[in-house]
Each structure stands twice: as structure tokens, then as C-alpha cells.
Amino acid sequence: MDDTTARERLESMLAELDRSIGVLRGDPVAVRDRSAADAGSDLTDADRTQAMLTVATAQRRAVVDALKRVDDGSYGRCVDCAKPVPDGRLEARPEASRCVQCQSKRERRR
């Protein structure tokens, strides 16, 4: 993927993530007199919202990092081995910072 296309896709992703994060950070559920079941449901919803916010924030960080790589000329190169990241991977995940092999190694270590 060329740098211009990558930048456009990444900037679009960043704008969408910023919108999503804004929605997820919206007003907390107002505390009212509720049944125990309703209160439990609110906690579950809050936990789910927090999990989605955590994922969106991490993805936003990856997109910002990818934009920095576009700026410094290293976009499309694996941050671990410096080999090219396959175009198919970048098409699917423009924010990808590692080739498939290095990403697999990283995930196995977790």
C-alpha cells in the first residue's frame, strides 16, 4: 500500500475511533433507585463499555503510531525484523506494525 493511501485510511480510522471513544466516554448511567437486577445489569453494561473503551483506545494508539511510521518513512516495514509487511496484511489492518511471523511470535509469548 502506498503512503498516500495508507495515510488516508489511517486518518479515516483515527476519526472513527475518536468518535467511538467519545460515545463510549459519554455520561455515566444515572444512579437511581433500582432493583438489584437493574443495578447488576448496569454494572455489566459499564464493564462492557469499559472493555470496549480499552480496546478502542489501544487501537487508536496503534493508528497514531502507524501515522508516525508513515511520516518517518518506516511504514510497511516490520518494527521487529524490518522486513516488508505483506500488502494483504496492510490492506486488512493498516495499523499493523509487524509482519505475520513476528506478530505470531509476539502473541505466543503472551
Predicted stretch roles:
Residues 72-76, 83:
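Conserved RNAP core-binding helix
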Residues 80-81, 101:
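Short, cysteine/histidine-rich loop/knuckle motifs that typically chelate Zn2+
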Residues 86, 107:
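Short functional micro-motifs and their immediate structural scaffolds
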Residues 76-79, 97:
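Cys/His-enriched microdomains
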Residues 95-104:
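Cysteine-rich micro-motifs
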Residues 1-72, 92, 109-110:
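Interaction interfaces in information-processing and related assembly proteins
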